[in-house]
Design a protein with these regions (language model features):
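Select transmembrane alpha-helical segments in multipass membrane proteins
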Residues: 9-12, 42, 75-98, 135-137, ...
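Extracellular/periplasmic helix-exit of transmembrane alpha-helices
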Residues: 48-64, 72, 76-79, 112-113, ...
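Hydrophobic, membrane-embedded alpha-helices of multi-pass small-molecule transporters
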Residues: 6-14, 52-56, 67-123, 187
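Hydrophobic alpha-helical transmembrane segments of multi-pass small-molecule transporters/permeases
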Residues: 14-17, 44-47, 91-92, 126-129, ...
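Transmembrane alpha-helical segments of multi-pass small-molecule transport proteins
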Residues: 2-23, 41-42, 180-185, 214-232
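Membrane-interface alpha-helices at helix entry/exit sites of multi-pass transporters
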Residues: 10, 115-131, 212-220
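Membrane-interface loop-to-helix entry segments
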Residues: 4-66, 206, 238-268, 272
Length: 298
């Protein structure tokens, strides 16, 4: 949107990232944390404005989505199954990249929250996935598909852009030149806050595995990877992301399945106490020491 070379962007982000991640300059992180929620709200409002501006296209857009996703146009060719498989594959890849469901990453943040009811915090985790995927992603898809930039019959993109630039052009159909600039700034803030979040995740994992002293090596390597991420081929970046997301999901999902009975017990206890108002002893953790600590806090 601003014609800034990727190399320059990478160098600037490496410097800022180093100040925050390695140097501990929290002021930049604090400003980012305050700006991101406002940008997210502004993005949703902007997408809603596009939605209502093109509301007459709702039927055509959702018809095109289902036809394209599930291969309804190819029923005669007998490849509906292939279309469904492709839709599920790409849906899961991009869904996991967007909402991190099943990766176990957001647990690090949720577990550090100061709440008395773990079930309530877990519900916020579920809500995040719904809001991200069902609300934000759906609004984004509608904004792009209803903008006239894509042929709904063939799926062909009618402009010479793709990815986030396509979203910027979709916003430009309603907001003019402000649209691409807004999307560029929003993505920059979202991406930078994500970088800070994942640096924390990795640092904690490295500390657990190799000790506190190892985190400085990790942080330096992480900051250098910011530049590589800014300049590398986008297709390779997606492939690496999908691969490592899958590798993270495998052990985490095994843990989720193994701990499901415990989660069910704690959830049923919460429903009985809070919703049904039954007089039962709170079950707040499977670990006795944490259970005792939480009971005292209540």
């Amino acid at each position: 949107a601003f014609s800034i070379p990727a190399t320059v962007t990478g160098i600037v982000l490496v410097i800022i990232g180093a100040l925050v991640i390695v140097g501990g300059l929290k002021r930049i992180a604090a400003v980012t944390e305050k700006l991101v929620p406002f940008m997210a709200i502004a993005y949703v409002i902007g997408a809603l404005i596009i939605f209502f501006a093109n509301i007459s296209h709702v039927g055509a857009v959702f018809t095109a989505i289902f036809k394209g996703a599930f291969g309804l146009k190819a029923v005669g060719g007998g490849i509906v199954g292939s279309g469904v498989k492709l839709a599920l594959t790409w849906g899961m890849k991009r869904g996991v990249f967007s909402n991190e469901a099943g990766l176990g990453s957001s647990v690090m943040v949720h577990s550090s929250s100061n709440v008395k009811e773990p079930v309530r915090q877990g519900m916020w985790g579920i809500f995040e996935v719904f809001a991200d995927t069902m609300v934000v992603c759906t609004l984004t898809a509608f904004a792009v598909l209803s903008s006239g930039l894509i042929d709904l019959d063939t799926g062909a993109v009618l402009v010479d852009v793709s990815g986030s630039a396509l979203v910027g052009q979709a916003f430009a159909t309603v907001f003019g030149s402000f649209g691409p600039a807004f999307i560029a700034i929003a993505i920059l803030l979202f991406a930078f806050s994500t970088v800070l979040g994942w640096s924390h995740y990795g640092s904690k994992a490295c500390e657990y595995l190799f000790g506190t002293k190892s985190t400085i090596v990790y942080k330096i390597a992480f900051v250098l990877m910011i530049f590589i991420g800014c300049t590398m081929n986008l297709g390779l970046a997606w492939d690496l992301s999908d691969t490592f997301n899958g590798l993270m999901a495998i052990p985490n999902l095994i843990g989720v399945i193994a701990l499901s009975p415990v989660v069910m017990k704690i959830t049923k206890n919460y429903v009985a106490r809070i919703i049904k108002k039954e007089d039962v002893k709170p079950m707040l953790s499977v670990f006795p020491e944490i259970q005792e600590e939480q009971e005292k806090a209540m």
